[in-house]
Regions:
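C-terminal motif of bacterial Sec signal peptides marking the signal peptidase cleavage site
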Residues: 18-20
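Sec-dependent signal peptide recognition
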Residues: 6-14
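Extended, charged catalytic domains and RNA/DNA-binding interfaces, predominantly
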Residues: 25-424
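Short, Lys/Arg-enriched N-terminal segments with co-localized hydrophobic residues
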Residues: 1-5
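Long, low-complexity intrinsically disordered regions enriched in Ser/Thr, Asp/Glu, Pro/Gly
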Residues: 10, 22-24
């Protein structure tokens, strides 16, 4: 495993070139999961490796929360931003990155994907007033009002709400797919079809447990709709679904994030039902989650001062509200140690993963520069004092990968894949 540490201070951005493959170790004729030719075949390779930068955690107006925040930028807008073009913030100013990214994934919430945008266009029915609120959201106060109305709908005793619309979810998922396909430029700008699985055993209240994952597809062979918390809140069921789809030629990996907000549940030493972890469970987790997102706008999940008392940088970018949650099982360094102990005592290690950083922007555009920091939450980003500050002169600018050609990012993230995105 080759690890690239890409920051001046302490935390790791995206590091992984699993197995750091030499040319001799890569079978050039290895078939892909859906038997399509590799996009990297015609792309020059650098035997000394290259460093690539990208963002695998981007939300657009298809995410229910981003739309509530007033974001009206689409997946296409997100990819335009990634390629260096200007896009508009919800408050009307331009957002633009200094240098184009090399790879990117729009990863909107599968949970009610596109439904809020769809409802905003409705002019009839029992929810007309709510639809009007969505359309007329212009200020931070409007956001708080529409959030309150949304929670009233979500907290209804009925299993069915105005948000349950599979047709809209499927058409929105197709929009995600189409945008990734339009903007994919092998060797120049690689896009991945993706979504966020937004789950937790406790979803509301003062201390919800964040068990969210971004699911990233290797190719354009993808299911007709994403798997969401409406299917199951148990991540183990997500892994089983991924295994099933992988057997059908739809290969993917999941990237957990915000372990710091998981209330100790992301890196437990037991299963979802609190039964004992076994080797089969460890293998399934590793197969589906070879990498975790340990730094983003909602703080670092690397470590905590109470877990690393001898590390003077352990308090860097700690999310204040995370201090109110259970630290044990919520941070990466501790999980790596737990995994080594489990390997020694039990013979298996479910936590031998790599790390990545990403933006988690809900503006369709990651904000990476201190001098022009626009934050992540649409209309809630203004006025400027709402955005707070970032202590680094150049805060975490997505992830970095060592690889030898520009479409092999996937293989650099995936312990068992070394061949990048494949053609459809």
């Amino acid at each position: 495993m080759r690890v690239a540490i890409m920051n001046k201070f302490y935390f790791i951005l995206l590091t992984i070139c699993f197995l750091g493959c030499s040319e001799e170790s890569i079978p050039q004729d290895l078939p892909s999961s859906n038997s399509h030719p590799l996009e990297s075949n015609s792309i020059p390779r650098n035997p000394l490796k290259n460093v690539y930068f990208g963002d695998t955690h981007v939300h657009t107006d298809l995410s229910f929360d981003a739309f509530l925040f007033g974001t009206r930028r689409t997946p296409d807008d997100a990819y335009y931003f990634g390629k260096g073009q200007k896009v508009k913030h919800a408050y009307g100013f331009n957002m633009q990155i200094k240098k184009p990214l090399d790879f990117m994934a729009v990863s909107d919430h599968a949970y009610y994907l596109g439904v809020l945008r769809h409802l905003s266009k409705s002019t009839s029915g029992d929810h007309t007033k709510f639809s009007k609120l969505l359309r007329e959201t212009k200020t931070a106060d409007d956001v708080f009002e529409v959030l309150a109305q949304t929670m009233r709908y979500l907290n209804q005793p009925s299993d069915k709400t105005i948000f349950d619309n599979k047709d809209v979810v499927r058409s929105s998922w197709q929009e995600v797919i189409d945008a990734a396909e339009r903007h994919n430029q092998p060797g120049k700008f690689t896009t991945f079809i993706a979504y966020e699985y937004t789950s937790g055993s406790v979803f509301s209240g003062p201390n919800p447990d964040n068990l969210h994952r971004n699911v990233i597809y290797r190719s354009s062979s993808v299911p007709i709709e994403p798997y969401s918390r409406l299917d199951s809140r148990n991540p183990e069921n997500l892994w089983s679904w991924m295994d099933k789809k992988r057997a059908e030629g739809m290969d993917s990996l999941a990237i957990p994030h915000n372990m710091n907000r998981s209330n100790g549940k992301m890196f437990k030493t037991t299963k979802w039902d609190d039964s004992r972890i076994d080797a089969q469970w460890a293998e399934q987790r590793l197969r589906n989650e070879p990498i975790v997102e340990n730094s983003q706008v909602k703080g670092t999940s690397d470590t905590h001062p109470l877990l690393s008392p001898n590390d003077e940088w352990a308090d860097f970018e700690i999310l204040p509200s995370a201090n109110e949650r259970d630290l044990n099982g919520s941070y990466v360094r501790q999980a790596l140690i737990k995994g080594l102990v489990m390997k020694e005592k039990l013979g298996f290690n479910p936590y031998q993963f790599g790390v990545i950083a990403a933006s988690d922007t809900h503006n369709a555009a990651g904000s990476f520069g201190e001098a022009n920091y626009w934050s992540k939450t649409g209309l809630l980003d203004n006025p400027a004092h709402r955005r707070g500050s970032v202590p680094l002169p150049e805060p975490a600018e997505e992830g970095s990968v060592y690889s030898d050609d520009a479409s092999r990012y996937w293989g650099s993230l995936r312990v068992s894949w070394r061949l990048g995105r494949v053609k459809h």
